[in-house]
Amino acid sequence: LVVRVLLYFYIITNHMKKLLFISAIVFLSCAFTQQKKTKVIFFGDSITELGVKRDRYVGYILKMDSMLKVQKKDDQYELHGTGISGNKVYDLYLRVEDDVLTKNPDVVVVYVGVNDVWHKTLRGTGTDADKFEKFYLAILKKLKDRNINAILCTPAVVGEKTDYSNPLDGDLNLYSNIIRDIAKKNSLPLIDLRKKYHDYLDKNNPDNKDRGILTYDGVHMNDAGNQFLADAMWKTIKEIK
C-alpha cells in the first residue's frame, strides 16, 4: 500500500511539474512576442509645443492619442511631442541629438517652416531659402544615419485667406515647394499641410477671413485645426511599417 501511495504521489508530482513547465513556456512566449510600440516623435515649433497641451485647446498630439484609444491602437503607438515656440529649421538641427536621437524613435514627423517665413517680417530673423534647405537636409541625414523613418510636413498657413492675399503666401509656397522637392528626391512620405489647409479653407471660408476657421490667430490651431492636423498626420503615420 505504501509503495502504491508513493508511486501515485510520484506520478502526480511529475504531472504537475510538466504542467508548470508548459505554463512557464507559454507565459514567456507571450511576453517575448508582445508587440513593441512604434515610438513617434513630432519635431517642430510652437504648433507642436501646443500639440501636447490642453491650455486654450486640446493639442493635435493629444487628439491623436484619443483617436488611437478609440481605434484600440494605443497599445501599438507611443506619441511624443518635442516642439519649442519660435523654433526655425536651424534650431531643430541644433537640438535634434538631445531631443530626438537620444530617445530612439521609430518615426519622426518634421513640422517646421512657419517661423522661417513669418519671422522675416515679424522679427527680421527668418531663414533664407537656400539655408532652409541645407539645414533641413542635414536633419534628415542625421535621422537616416540612425535608420529612423522621417515624415515631412509643409507649413500650413500664416493667415487663412483663400485668395492668396495673405502677405506671406508667396514665401510659404516657396518653402513648401522646397520640402515637396526634398520628399520627392529622397522618396520620403509627405503630409502636404499647405495644400490640405488651403483646400479645406477654400470650401469653408466663404468670407475670406484671415483667422478663425482652423486657427485662432492665423497661425496656431484652434480646436478644429488641431483635429484637422491630427487626422491628416494619422493618415500618413499609420502607413509606416
Outline where the language-model segments fall.
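Acidic, Ala/Val/Gly-enriched low-complexity intrinsically disordered segments
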Residues: 2-5
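Positively charged n-region of N-terminal signal peptides that target proteins for export
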Residues: 13-19
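Sec-dependent N-terminal signal peptides
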Residues: 19-28
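Residues that line or immediately flank small-molecule/substrate-binding pockets and catalytic motifs
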Residues: 23, 44, 112
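Alpha-helical transmembrane segments and their juxtamembrane interfaces
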Residues: 27-28, 55, 202, 232
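Serine-esterase "nucleophile elbow" of acetyl-processing enzymes
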Residues: 30-85, 90, 95-104
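Alpha-helical cap/lid subdomain in secreted, periplasmic
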Residues: 35, 67-75, 91-241
